[in-house]
Amino acid sequence: MLMLLLIIVGLILALIVLGIVIYIVSIYNRFQTLKNGAEATLGQIRVALKKRLDMINQLVEAVKSYASFEKETLTKITELRSSVLKANTAEEIQNIERESRNILGNILVAVENYPELKTSETVKELMDAIKEIEDEIARHRYTYNNIVQEFNTKIDTFPSNIVANLFGFRKMDYLQFEEEIYERPKISF
């Protein structure tokens, strides 16, 4: 009888340990899923930023016969295009975002100064394409920040914070933009 009782207690303890292990594995898997989702979304943002830079480059080509652009601007666009696909952190993405917005802002000023550019079909098409890319970037940024919020909340809450510490998960950075560039560039004709 005592042996049967020990076997039952042993089975109960084994089931409890198995339940805890399964729970830890499920929390770990959720962290991995969120981390991979954030990385994939950053990849989509990188692709969208590269598309934006390609469009900006085409816009510069369309506008430069009217307005003079410094060689530095063209060089900067090329540098940003090559660095965007290498960017691995939210901070690097934010820096590229900020610099490309500054360049786009300068181009928009040039377009405003030359009324004949506003009526150019090529310029209109490029501006429409840039607007679509801006919307795409905004959607990806929203998705990324939602994933990061869930990831960071899990790190802050019990019992998932124990699993996070056990496996070395650290909080992720949100994609945040400076106040003066937070608004999408206004593209209108």
Curated annotation (Swiss-Prot):
It comes from the Archaea. Gene3D superfamilies: LemA-like domain (1.20.1440.20). Keywords: Cell membrane, Coiled coil, Membrane, Transmembrane, Transmembrane helix. It is a single-pass membrane protein. SUPFAM superfamilies: LemA-like. The chain crosses the membrane at residues 2-22. One of its GO terms (cellular component) is plasma membrane. It is found in: Cell membrane. It holds the Pfam family LemA. Residues 87-150 form a coiled coil. Its main location: membrane. Belongs to the LemA family. This is Protein LemA. It comes from Methanocaldococcus jannaschii (strain ATCC 43067 / DSM 2661 / JAL-1 / JCM 10045 / NBRC 100440) (Methanococcus jannaschii).
